Amino acid sequence: RTVYMALLMTCTFTRAAQLVDIMIWHDTTYHVISYLRARIVHAEQQVTNAPRGKGRAPKRERKSAKASDHKRLQQQLLQFIDEEVAYYADTIACLVQRYALDETCSVLSALAIQIQPQHEASLAESARVPAHRHQLYEIIQRLLTCMGDLHRYRELHSAVPDRHHRVFFHFTRAVLFYHQAHVLLPDHGNPSNQLAVVATTVGDSFGAVYQYYRALCVRVPFDNARHNLQRMLEKALHAWSSSARRDDVLVAWRQAALEDCPARRVPVPSISARWDSTHDYFDSLVAFHSLCVLRADLDTACVLHDAILRHMLMAVDMHELRAVDYLRMLVTGVCASMTT
């Protein structure tokens, strides 16, 4: 890490320092986090599974020791995350000070990252070159995204289950870092991909699809988002294949095919245009995207599209959806037409 930091701070615009900030994350921070998380998962499995081995110590004592080991690993991970958050904040502050990136202060102040107004004149002059300045923005955006990842990992391993053993995650801090990273360079897709990861974790499938499309339909797309979107749509298609609404579509097509009277025949049959909840409605919207993007069943997609559209028109009259929901549906539709 010392070598990487020396390259980042002293040879920032050289070829040797290209993407060195990513190396800092992957080779040091993420490597340790992955190791500790793997050990935590292993410790959880040992605590969950009752010990069956023979030994002098009672089973209760052995299970208590494993629970203590699991708690110790959790504390080590959280402590390491706190140290890394401080490290990345100091690195960002140092870059902003050295190169006089004053226009980033509004973004950093929203994240409570303190910046001193001092800077070196010679380094500030080198950052006036547009290509160099843009490179610094990219570095800071990636570092902010890394800090968002750290806050996300912290929440994943610090959230406490309720009395029903349910865990509710609050990724407010992580989302704030991802959002500010996006604000810094809106034409880069990496922060949107991470926002999609958060949406997936909290069960917001449509929000995840929306963010994956945003990660792809920008000047600098995040290539892994395409694979992530593909997996999410395949999962949605699998869930749709066993859903009750799919059965309604099949029944509607079957009844339409059995209609003998030409005057009563319709080109596309209809199904109920009401969903029990907004969450179910957006899940069906994701299923519609999966049917179209994966080209699984366009006849079914036509029927589902008709029901989705009629429900949306009723939702407008009843004010069931938020303004941001309509915006997301519009953006998702436009992006889907650009990427398929």
Located regions from the model:
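Extended charged low-complexity segments that act as oligomerization/scaffolding linkers
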Residues: 207, 224, 234-258
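A conserved position within tetratricopeptide repeats
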Residues: 8, 40-41, 47-48, 85, ...
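Extended alpha-helical solenoid scaffold regions that build the rod-like backbones
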Residues: 2-64, 70, 74-77, 246-340
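Short coil/turn linking the two alpha-helices of tandem helical-hairpin repeats
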Residues: 33-56, 62, 69, 85, ...
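Internal alpha-helical scaffold/solenoid segments in large eukaryotic proteins
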Residues: 162-234
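Flexible helix-coil transition and linker loops at the boundaries of alpha-helical arrays
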Residues: 87-140, 179-185
